[in-house]
Amino acid sequence: MPTFPQSFPMNGGDGPHSYIHNSSYQKVAIDGAKEKTSEAILKNLDLELLNRNSDENILRIADFGCSIGPNTFEVVQNIIDTVKQKNLKENNAYIGAPLEFQVCFNDQPNNDFNTLFRTQPISSKQAYLSVGVPGSFHGRVLPKNSLHIGHITYALHWLSTVPQHVCDKKSPALNKSYIQCNNLVEEVTEAYRVQFKKDMGDFLGARAEELVSGGLMILSGQCLPDGVPKALTWQGVVIDMIGDCLMDMAKQGITTKEKIELFSLPIYIPHISEFKAEIERNENFSIETMEKISHPMDYKPLTNDFITSMFRAILNTIIEEHFGDGVVNELFDRFAKKLNKYPIDFKRCKKYVNYFIVLKRK
């Protein structure tokens, strides 16, 4: 059986291959949703309702799957600035005391929280109280009825675990030819789909317990257009190419074919109709906003160096855990060369659908 870690965070530290220096693709998406996030809070957050039954003057915010780097701090600051704006505009008495903010930064236990808090802007330390919350967001990580605004971006495609059958040699769902779910093998896709549905149910169920009545959950990320396999997107092409590089390394004895067959990424990009169905299935929330948004970088080709650096920052930890030390450098050196020889044809590749969703706890 595979030796996947229980958690698979982005590459830590602040070196050249770290996520902190290779997350601009995600930053552009966050910046693109910034105005919509503010509009959603101004329209849907009821400050009086949130604290009607509370003696506290603290508004709690959580960023789930925060990783490291500036993106999470920018998200949180935008939320706080908007709440302050709303509070001032409404001249809200808000329990008669100055409004304070507590921010919970959540990610897997082996996320690099040291780097996260070491790089926290000084100004933010004066604006809110910070707490690191290690744990999978597929389960409850905060006390019941304690959260006012939850946020998650570009993280829900990570599953809680690799579907068991895709690494079972006796199963028809064995993902023998690929290291991802690229939707080309139906048995593999179905195994991933089942795991995704369970994880989405667990995620929304946990947030329903944590959020107070009237609290908001803001989600953004990517889905596949209905009927389009991931293999036809540029992201799918990239990961399949990384898998090809691993097979080349196996032929030269650097790793083994068996190890590759037992390696499959715990990532599932659902089709937009699948994702919408799972959101609607949970009856604890009302859907205030559900819309498609554009990613500014979808309309221009990315450089090979950019692609290599981004995917190394994302996949470094899980590849190293499964294949051992020394494989990652060789793998991404080979990948960079293969990418230069066979560059991505962005005009032919299908594009992901970017979504922005606002849920309100009933």
Curated annotation (Swiss-Prot):
It comes from the Eukaryota. Its cofactor is Mg(2+). This is Probable S-adenosylmethionine-dependent methyltransferase At5g37990. PANTHER family: S-ADENOSYL-L-METHIONINE:CARBOXYL METHYLTRANSFERASE FAMILY PROTEIN. Binds 1 Mg(2+) ion per subunit. Homodimer. Its EC number is 2.1.1.-. GO terms for molecular function: metal ion binding; methyltransferase activity. Keywords: Magnesium, Metal-binding, Methyltransferase, S-adenosyl-L-methionine, Transferase. One of its GO terms (biological process) is methylation. It is an enzyme of class 2 (transferase). The lineage of its organism: Eukaryota, Viridiplantae, Streptophyta, Embryophyta, Tracheophyta. Belongs to the methyltransferase superfamily. Type-7 methyltransferase family. Mg(2+) binds at residues 175, 261, 263. S-adenosyl-L-homocysteine binds at residues 19, 66, 71, 107, 136-137.
